[in-house]
C-alpha cells in the first residue's frame, strides 16, 4: 500500500463510529459486555471439551475448534475497537492494519468453511447413525478441521497481498472500525475492478459453497427426522436445527452482504454496522446455541464445578 507520490503510509485512522459520538458510549458498554460473554462462553467450551472424556467426540472436537476460532477472532478486533471508541487517538499503524487484516480475514474465512464442514458431522449422526463411528474417523475429522484452517488463511494471504500491491491516493482515513478489504479498496486511486472481481469469485467459494452444503445437509436431516414417530424427538431435532440455522443465517447473511455486492453499491456506513454481526455478535451467540444448552455440556460443567468444590 503505497501513496501515489511514492511515499509510504505510516498508518490509518479508523473513523469507526466517530460521526456518532453519543452512540460510541453505548457501543462501548454493549460490546464490552458481549466480549466478556464471548470469552467466558468459548473458554468454557474449550476447557470442558478437554477435561471431560465424554466430550471427546467429533462433534465437540469441531465445537472446540469453533470456540478457539471465535476467541481469537474477537480478541483480534474488539480490544482495538474498545480503545478507539473511548480514546481520542483512533489511529492504527501500517503494520498493525496489515496484521489485523490478515488475521481477522483468515479467521473469518476459516469459520465460513468450518461451519460448512461441521454440518457434515450432524448429517452423518442423524442420517447415517449406524455408520457414524466408521464415517467420522479421527483422521477424517482432524483433516476436515485442518483443511478449513488452511483454506481460510490461504484466502487471507491472497487478499492481503493483493491489498498491499494497491496504490493509495494519500488518504488514510478508513470508514470502518477495523482493517477490512472492502473499505481498503475504497482508498485506492487505481482501477480496482480486477480486485473486486477476484474478491467476488473467492467469496462465492468461501461463502456460498458452505451455505449450499448446509442447506442440503439440513434438508436431508429434516427428511430423516420426519421418519421419527415420536413427536418429542421431532421437536428436539427441529428446535436444535432451527437455532443452528438462525445463527448460520446471521453469520453468512451479513458476510455475504459485505463481500458479495458490487463495489459501487457498497455503503461504508452500513458496512461497518453489518460487520458487527459476523465479527462480534455471532461469536458470542455460537457457544450458547451450539453447546451450552446441550445436556452433555451441562453435565460436564456440573462435574467440573463439583470436583473443584470438593477439592476445597
From Swiss-Prot:
UniProt cross-references to Pfam families, sorted A to Z: 7tm_4 (PF13853)
PROSITE patterns for the chain: G_PROTEIN_RECEP_F1_2
Positions on the Cytoplasmic side per record topology: 50-57, 121-139, 220-236, 293-312
UniProt protein name: Olfactory receptor 2B8
Extracellular topology ranges: 1-25, 80-100, 159-195, 260-272
Keyword Aminoacyl-tRNA synthetase appears in the UniProt entry: no
Keyword vocabulary terms for this entry: Cell membrane, Disulfide bond, G-protein coupled receptor, Glycoprotein, Membrane, Olfaction, Receptor, Sensory transduction, Transducer, Transmembrane, Transmembrane helix
Transmembrane segments: 26-49, 58-79, 101-120, 140-158, 196-219, 237-259, 273-292
GO CC term, one of those recorded: plasma membrane
PANTHER family: OLFACTORY RECEPTOR (PTHR26453)
Membrane topology summary: Multi-pass membrane protein
InterPro entries tied to this protein: GPCR_Rhodpsn, GPCR_Rhodpsn_7TM, Olfact_rcpt
Biological role: Odorant receptor.
GO BP term (any one): detection of chemical stimulus involved in sensory perception of smell
Family, as annotated: Belongs to the G-protein coupled receptor 1 family.
Superkingdom as given in the UniProt entry: Eukaryota
Glycan attachment sites: 5, 195, 265
Keyword Disulfide bond included in the entry's annotation: yes
Gene3D superfamilies: Rhodopsin 7-helix transmembrane proteins
An MF annotation (GO) of this entry: G protein-coupled receptor activity
Location within or outside the cell: Cell membrane
Disulfide bonds: 97-189
Amino acid at each position: 500500500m503505497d501513496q501515489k507520490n511514492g511515499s509510504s503510509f505510516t498508518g490509518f485512522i479508523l473513523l469507526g463510529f466517530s460521526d456518532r459520538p453519543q452512540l460510541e458510549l453505548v457501543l462501548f458498554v454493549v460490546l464490552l459486555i458481549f466480549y466478556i460473554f464471548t470469552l467466558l462462553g468459548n473458554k468454557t467450551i474449550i476447557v470442558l471439551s478437554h477435561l471431560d472424556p465424554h466430550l471427546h467426540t467429533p462433534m465437540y472436537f469441531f465445537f472446540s475448534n469453533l470456540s478457539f476460532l471465535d476467541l481469537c477472532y474477537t480478541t483480534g478486533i474488539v480490544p482495538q475497537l474498545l480503545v478507539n471508541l473511548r480514546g481520542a487517538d483512533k489511529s492504527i499503524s501500517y503494520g498493525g492494519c496489515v496484521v489485523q487484516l490478515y488475521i481477522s480475514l483468515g479467521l473469518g474465512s476459516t469459520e465460513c468453511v468450518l461451519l460448512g464442514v461441521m454440518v457434515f458431522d450432524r448429517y452423518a449422526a442423524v442420517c447415517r447413525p449406524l455408520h457414524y463411528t466408521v464415517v467420522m474417523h479421527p483422521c477424517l475429522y482432524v483433516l476436515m478441521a485442518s483443511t478449513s484452517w488452511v483454506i481460510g488463511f490461504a484466502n487471507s494471504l491472497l487478499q492481503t497481498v493483493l491489498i498491499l500491491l494497491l496504490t493509495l491516493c494519500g488518504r488514510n482515513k478508513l470508514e470502518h472500525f477495523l482493517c477490512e478489504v472492502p473499505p481498503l479498496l475504497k482508498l485506492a486511486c487505481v482501477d480496482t475492478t480486477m480486485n473486486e472481481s477476484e474478491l467476488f469469485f473467492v467469496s462465492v467459494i468461501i461463502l456460498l459453497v458452505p451455505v449450499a452444503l448446509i442447506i442440503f445437509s439440513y434438508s436431508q436431516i429434516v427428511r430423516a427426522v420426519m421418519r421419527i414417530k415420536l413427536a418429542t424427538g421431532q421437536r428436539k431435532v427441529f428446535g436444535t436445527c432451527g437455532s443452528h440455522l438462525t445463527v448460520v443465517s446471521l453469520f453468512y447473511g451479513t458476510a455475504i452482504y459485505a463481500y458479495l455486492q458490487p463495489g459501487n453499491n457498497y455503503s461504508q456506513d452500513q458496512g461497518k454496522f453489518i460487520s458487527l454481526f459476523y465479527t462480534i455478535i455471532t461469536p458470542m451467540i455460537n457457544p450458547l446455541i451450539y453447546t451450552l444448552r446441550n445436556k452433555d455440556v451441562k453435565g460436564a460443567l456440573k462435574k467440573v464445578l463439583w470436583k473443584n468444590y470438593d477439592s476445597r
